[in-house]
Amino acid sequence: MKLIVGLGNPGEKYAKTKHNVGYWVLDLLAEKLALSFDQKTENGIYVKQPDFILAKPTTFMNKSGDFVEELIKFYKINTQDLMIIYDDMNFEVGQAAIKTTGSAGGQRGMAHIIEKCKTKEIKRLKIGISRGENAKEYVLSPFLPKDNAKIKLVIEEAANILIFYLSNSFITTIEKFNANKNKV
């Protein structure tokens, strides 16, 4: 069973911030699949299908690993079937990258997930948000109007890639993503 987790911060205050692009991708993915997040735990919300789970932690970003660990243990999911979607300041707005492993790159939600899962071997889909002077203020602010079209396009592409991934291998998904990379 595949577990796809979109990271963000809960609450209306953070809904339109750069740090919530993981939520945005999951929301669009669920919408495209005509699914709703109908299951809830203390740490998050999710929708379970026979072959996959889409999940959003409702803890603050730096505690995202608690919810991921909870779902992995309860549903006996192998971390090889886990994919995390989150914002990355090392990529420009409009860029995305799929990785099979690596460090958290300063992203505290991903760092907590790596800590809880006890491995860096976690698939991830990083959504570029560019870099600001004050990282904390920057990630907790909305995108500039000039970036809205780019971010909308990359969120759409990310959701489409995940739809493809749900019925294909990760290797095939990476190949398709890389073939389409220059089109985003």
Swiss-Prot record:
Keywords: Cytoplasm, Hydrolase, RNA-binding, tRNA-binding. The active site is at residue 19. It is found in: Cytoplasm. PROSITE patterns: PEPT_TRNA_HYDROL_1 (PS01195). The record marks 87 as: Stabilizes the basic form of H active site to accept a proton. It catalyses: an N-acyl-L-alpha-aminoacyl-tRNA + H2O = an N-acyl-L-amino acid + a tRNA + H(+). Its EC number is 3.1.1.29. The keyword Aminoacyl-tRNA synthetase does not apply. Belongs to the PTH family. Monomer. This is Peptidyl-tRNA hydrolase. It comes from Mesomycoplasma hyopneumoniae (strain J / ATCC 25934 / NCTC 10110). The gene is pth.
